[in-house]
Amino acid sequence: EFFDRNDFGIASFTIDPLNDTPMVLKQYSERLNVKSPNWHFLTGKIDDVYELSNSGFNIFSGVNPAVAGGFEHQGFFALIDKNGYIRSRRDANGNPIVYYLGITSSGASEQGIDMIKEDIIKLLNNGWI
């Protein structure tokens, strides 16, 4: 619902950069029927990808030969404002909820999807994105 806005974008980072070449990611975006020029599917050197995920966003991703596919990740979304800061909301106790849950392995939408949409609207309305 935000894709017609020039002040909103999505960056999706692969956690399997050895296999997810730019061509593979392009095909993936086509399978998802992504039409927005503001949704970017990104890859890079494996060490850089995991460094960005683990140290930049503090969202775990890494190689694990013991799991299906050989790698694992937390599957969270981070909401980043136009200044590069991670934005968050607070829970009932006033603690920050930094990341949003997305889609479960069964494909069910999590409450986090609704939460991130609400927070995107707040940031857009206040000029923070």
Across the structure, where does each feature detected by a protein language model lie?
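Sec/Tat-exported extracytoplasmic proteins
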Residues: 1, 32, 53-61, 120-128
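Structural microenvironment flanking redox-active thiols in thiol-disulfide oxidoreductases
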Residues: 1-52
